[in-house]
């Protein structure tokens, strides 16, 4: 596992380019920094400055090499690289609250933006007018949209929001794509059609994710639950109440395996059993070093109380690689079908790249199916 600390500021969101040689992230500010790997070091090569509010979402299209960003200024920008300079194009989202998340569609001909306006903006490029326009998905969203993920068919869109619901909508835009083929989630897909709505969550839905096939959707909530809906099993929902602090992000790494992370500062593996319809804990992927678990002596305890007016509980350092909450997960190589590497960024200003095979060999009982 390779860990790199970029800054002291928290990393609120990130995105990788196609060959995973460059990473774009927001250091909890109005700007986006782009770093390039140079041997074992990372060097800053670009700084994107256009937003006048905190950047809340970044996505990097692998084929067209365009970056889309959104922020609390209620705007989105599409960035295009010309002569080694990133040029922004403003996208009017027609919202009156902060944008919270953004995702390119698989075919990169549109993108979705979730916001505090209780709606999702589906943005696409109009060739005739030479600008980006958007359509809104509103009903039945009743609160801020916190996370988005596209189905592989480029039409269905998963959304998690702070009204305790995860949903799947049709984001079919007839101007830019052909009529979609039927899926296990449904056959009729006019724009804005609600294909699925969860009822099992009792907390804000922080993250949603489709599997590689698109037949399963997973989500994590602030009540420390992780859930999966399987469209091939009549949209059966399987949930697991975890013993961790709330999870903030989740991704499939195979069709039956998921990695999630959040306030516990380490990634966790979960296994879905299709036959049994169960979700189980697969193991912690960041084992603490036992040598550093030494207790304090009575003398040290009283010295701390005398000098710092603090107890020993305030002086325990985390043994995980990340020293603060993990805010985002992304698959680096192998895709969601058979991930070989994934990346985490956190509020400690650090980024870690995890090698799946190395994790399997380092942990005896770990089996990723």
Swiss-Prot record:
Pfam families from the UniProt entry: WD40
Q: Could you confirm whether the keyword Repeat appears in this record?
A: yes
Q: Where does the secretion signal sit in this chain?
A: none
> What InterPro entries does this protein map onto?
ARPC1 (IPR017383), WD40/YVTN_repeat-like_dom_sf (IPR015943), WD40_repeat_dom_sf (IPR036322), WD40_rpt (IPR001680)
Give the subcellular location.
Cytoplasm, Cytoskeleton; Nucleus
What's any GO biological process attached to this entry? Arp2/3 complex-mediated actin nucleation
Recorded GO cellular component terms are:
Arp2/3 protein complex; cytoplasm; nucleus
Chain positions of WD repeats? 6-45, 50-89, 94-135, 140-179, 200-239, 242-282, 321-364
Major location, coarse class? cytoplasm
* An annotated Gene Ontology molecular function: actin filament binding
Domain of life, per UniProt, equals Eukaryota
Keyword annotations:
Actin-binding, Cytoplasm, Cytoskeleton, Nucleus, Repeat, WD repeat
SMART domains associated with the record: WD40
Q: PANTHER family under this entry?
A: ACTIN-RELATED PROTEIN 2/3 COMPLEX SUBUNIT 1, ACTIN-RELATED PROTEIN 2_3 COMPLEX SUBUNIT 1B
Subunit annotation = Component of the Arp2/3 complex composed of actr2/arp2, actr3/arp3, arpc1 (arpc1a or arpc1b), arpc2, arpc3, arpc4 and arpc5.
Family of the protein in this entry:
Belongs to the WD repeat ARPC1 family.
Described by its record, this protein's role is as follows: Component of the Arp2/3 complex, a multiprotein complex that mediates actin polymerization upon stimulation by nucleation-promoting factor (NPF). The Arp2/3 complex mediates the formation of branched actin networks in the cytoplasm, providing the force for cell motility. In addition to its role in the cytoplasmic cytoskeleton, the Arp2/3 complex also promotes actin polymerization in the nucleus, thereby regulating gene transcription and repair of damaged DNA.
Protein name, entry field: Actin-related protein 2/3 complex subunit 1B-A
| Native species | Xenopus laevis (African clawed frog)
């Amino acid at each position: 596992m390779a860990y790199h600390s970029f800054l002291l500021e928290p990393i609120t969101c990130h995105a990788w380019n196609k060959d995973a040689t460059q990473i774009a992230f927001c250091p909890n500010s109005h700007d986006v920094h782009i770093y390039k790997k140079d041997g074992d070091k990372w060097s800053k090569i670009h700084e994107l400055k256009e937003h006048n509010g905190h950047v809340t979402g970044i996505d990097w299209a692998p084929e067209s090499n365009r970056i889309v960003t959104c922020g609390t200024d209620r705007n989105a920008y599409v960035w295009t690289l010309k002569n080694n300079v990133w040029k922004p194009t403003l996208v009017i989202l027609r919202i009156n609250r902060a944008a919270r998340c953004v995702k390119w569609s698989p075919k990169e001909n549109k993108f979705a933006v979730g916001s505090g306006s209780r709606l999702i903006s589906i943005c696409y490029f109009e060739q005739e007018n030479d600008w980006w326009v958007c359509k809104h998905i509103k009903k039945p969203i009743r609160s801020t949209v916190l996370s988005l993920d596209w189905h592989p068919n480029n039409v269905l869109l998963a959304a998690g929001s702070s009204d305790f619901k995860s949903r799947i909508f049709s984001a079919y835009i007839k101007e830019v794509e052909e009529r979609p083929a039927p899926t296990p989630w449904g056959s009729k897909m006019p724009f804005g059609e609600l294909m699925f709505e969860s009822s099992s969550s009792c907390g804000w839905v922080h993250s949603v994710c489709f599997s590689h096939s698109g037949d399963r959707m997973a989500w994590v909530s602030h009540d420390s639950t992780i859930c999966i809906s399987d469209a091939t099993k009549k949209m059966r929902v399987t949930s697991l109440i975890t013993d961790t602090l709330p999870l903030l992000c989740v991704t499939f790494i195979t069709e039956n395996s998921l990695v999630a992370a959040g306030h516990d500062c380490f990634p966790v593996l979960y296994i879905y059993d299709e036959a049994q319809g169960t979700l189980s804990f697969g193991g912690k992927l960041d084992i603490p070093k036992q040598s550093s678990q030494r207790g304090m002596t009575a003398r040290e305890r009283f010295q701390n109380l005398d000098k710092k007016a603090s107890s020993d509980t305030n002086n325990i350092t985390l043994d995980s690689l990340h020293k603060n909450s993990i805010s985002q997960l992304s698959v680096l190589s192998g895709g969601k079908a058979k991930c070989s590497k994934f990346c985490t960024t956190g509020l400690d200003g650090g980024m870690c790249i995890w090698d799946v095979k190395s994790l399997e060999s380092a942990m005896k009982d770990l089996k990723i199916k």
